[in-house]
Protein backbone atom coordinates (compact mmCIF):
# COMPACT_ATOMS: atom_id res chain seq x y z
CA UNK A 1 0.00 0.00 0.00
CA UNK A 2 1.35 3.42 -0.96
CA UNK A 3 0.76 6.34 1.42
CA UNK A 4 1.46 10.03 0.93
CA UNK A 5 0.63 13.56 2.19
CA UNK A 6 1.67 12.85 5.77
CA UNK A 7 -0.04 9.45 5.76
CA UNK A 8 -3.48 10.82 4.91
CA UNK A 9 -3.73 9.63 1.29
CA UNK A 10 -3.39 5.94 0.43
CA UNK A 11 -3.75 3.52 -2.45
CA UNK A 12 -4.37 -0.16 -1.83
CA UNK A 13 -5.58 -2.76 -4.34
CA UNK A 14 -8.19 -3.97 -1.82
CA UNK A 15 -9.69 -0.57 -0.97
CA UNK A 16 -11.88 1.53 -3.29
CA UNK A 17 -10.92 -0.57 -6.28
CA UNK A 18 -7.30 0.48 -5.99
CA UNK A 19 -8.17 4.16 -6.39
CA UNK A 20 -6.44 6.81 -4.32
CA UNK A 21 -8.44 7.43 -1.16
CA UNK A 22 -8.24 9.04 2.25
CA UNK A 23 -6.36 6.60 4.50
CA UNK A 24 -8.64 4.74 6.89
CA UNK A 25 -11.77 5.72 4.96
CA UNK A 26 -13.51 4.51 1.85
CA UNK A 27 -13.65 8.04 0.49
CA UNK A 28 -11.74 8.51 -2.73
CA UNK A 29 -9.78 11.62 -3.59
CA UNK A 30 -12.03 11.74 -6.66
CA UNK A 31 -15.11 11.97 -4.41
CA UNK A 32 -13.66 14.98 -2.59
CA UNK A 33 -12.76 16.60 -5.91
CA UNK A 34 -16.30 16.15 -7.25
CA UNK A 35 -17.84 17.58 -4.08
CA UNK A 36 -15.47 20.54 -4.07
CA UNK A 37 -14.89 21.36 -7.74
CA UNK A 38 -18.18 20.26 -9.31
CA UNK A 39 -20.73 20.64 -6.53
CA UNK A 40 -19.17 23.75 -5.03
CA UNK A 41 -18.82 22.40 -1.50
CA UNK A 42 -16.25 24.02 0.76
CA UNK A 43 -13.88 21.80 2.76
CA UNK A 44 -15.93 22.64 5.88
CA UNK A 45 -19.13 21.53 4.13
CA UNK A 46 -17.49 18.26 3.08
CA UNK A 47 -16.51 17.56 6.70
CA UNK A 48 -20.08 18.33 7.77
CA UNK A 49 -21.41 15.86 5.17
CA UNK A 50 -18.82 13.18 6.03
CA UNK A 51 -18.10 13.73 9.73
CA UNK A 52 -15.58 10.88 9.91
CA UNK A 53 -13.24 13.06 7.83
CA UNK A 54 -11.17 15.86 9.27
CA UNK A 55 -10.50 19.18 7.62
CA UNK A 56 -6.88 18.05 7.23
CA UNK A 57 -8.09 14.91 5.38
CA UNK A 58 -10.07 17.02 2.92
CA UNK A 59 -7.21 19.44 2.36
CA UNK A 60 -4.80 16.52 1.86
CA UNK A 61 -7.14 15.05 -0.76
CA UNK A 62 -7.33 18.38 -2.56
CA UNK A 63 -3.55 18.82 -2.35
CA UNK A 64 -3.11 15.35 -3.85
CA UNK A 65 -5.52 16.29 -6.63
CA UNK A 66 -3.67 19.50 -7.48
CA UNK A 67 -0.39 17.56 -7.59
CA UNK A 68 -1.90 14.72 -9.69
CA UNK A 69 -4.60 16.41 -11.77
CA UNK A 70 -4.07 14.30 -14.87
CA UNK A 71 -4.36 11.03 -12.92
CA UNK A 72 -7.56 12.09 -11.14
CA UNK A 73 -9.10 13.52 -14.31
CA UNK A 74 -8.38 10.23 -16.10
CA UNK A 75 -10.18 8.39 -13.26
CA UNK A 76 -13.09 10.80 -13.61
CA UNK A 77 -13.26 10.23 -17.38
CA UNK A 78 -13.09 6.45 -16.92
CA UNK A 79 -15.99 6.60 -14.46
CA UNK A 80 -18.03 8.73 -16.86
CA UNK A 81 -17.37 6.25 -19.66
CA UNK A 82 -18.33 3.34 -17.40
CA UNK A 83 -21.56 5.09 -16.38
CA UNK A 84 -22.40 5.88 -20.00
CA UNK A 85 -21.78 2.27 -21.01
CA UNK A 86 -24.04 1.10 -18.19
CA UNK A 87 -26.81 3.50 -19.29
CA UNK A 88 -26.41 2.32 -22.87
CA UNK A 89 -26.63 -1.37 -21.97
CA UNK A 90 -29.32 -0.94 -19.30
CA UNK A 91 -31.86 1.52 -20.71
CA UNK A 92 -34.71 2.75 -18.54
CA UNK A 93 -38.01 1.07 -19.27
CA UNK A 94 -41.46 2.36 -18.43
Segment roles from a protein language model:
Residues 24:
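Anion-recognition interface
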Residues 1-19:
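Basic, low-complexity segments
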Amino acid sequence: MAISIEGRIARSPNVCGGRVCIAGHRVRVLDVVVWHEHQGMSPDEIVTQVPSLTLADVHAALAYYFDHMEEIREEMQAERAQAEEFRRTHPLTA
